[in-house]
């Protein structure tokens, strides 16, 4: 059974991120969708005898969080590159929320980019916490370790090498981060926040 469907992302030519890198990256995303379905189906199969399969089920559930979060993180990531670069609206809710939290948009951006230089593979995620009304920046190892429970992703930056390997050596990942922001569609990020606030 296919519970999750692969989304289509029509991404125009980007500055500093090649079509080849996007093409290969999208193939990896499709793998996360496929594996999320595969693991979920295996869970349903082994749940027929949960006592006998308790350890197998435990490992499948662990694996599912990796595949599922990999799928969802990539959906936020690619969606933010669709439609070409759109500047952040300095009168918009997102900009004002960032200013309220960090003092200025520039200070937030410095912190976010700084987190992206964390050693290892993972994501930088800007979350909105509906309960407290605060925005939070967070490093997430792999796809799922460090995800903040109950918080909604607003902006996801993929810091796995596969996100930039065709364009930059790992020692130059800072250039990839700059390229990401050169192509970011802030209207999409604003929509992500509005969806949470509704």
Model-found features: residue ranges?
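Feature for soluble, non-membrane regions of globular proteins
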Residues: 1-198
């Amino acid at each position: 059974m296919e519970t999750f469907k692969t989304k289509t992302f029509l991404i125009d030519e980007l500055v500093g991120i090649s079509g080849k890198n996007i093409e290969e990256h999208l193939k990896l995303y499709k793998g996360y969708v496929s594996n999320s379905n595969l693991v979920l189906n295996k869970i349903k199969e082994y749940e027929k005898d949960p006592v006998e399969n308790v350890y197998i089920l435990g490992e499948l559930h662990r694996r599912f969080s990796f595949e599922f979060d990999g799928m969802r993180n990539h959906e936020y990531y690619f969606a933010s590159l669709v439609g070409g670069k759109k500047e952040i609206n300095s009168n918009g809710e997102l900009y004002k929320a960032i200013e309220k939290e960090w003092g200025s948009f520039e200070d937030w951006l410095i912190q976010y980019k700084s987190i992206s230089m964390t050693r290892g593979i993972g994501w930088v995620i800007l979350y909105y916490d509906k309960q407290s009304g605060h925005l939070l920046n967070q490093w997430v190892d792999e796809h799922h370790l460090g995800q903040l429970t109950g918080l909604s992703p607003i902006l996801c930056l993929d810091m796995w090498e596969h996100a930039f390997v065709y364009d930059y050596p790992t020692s130059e990942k800072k250039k990839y981060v700059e390229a990401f922001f050169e192509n970011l569609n802030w209207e999409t990020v604003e929509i992500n926040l509005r969806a949470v606030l509704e």
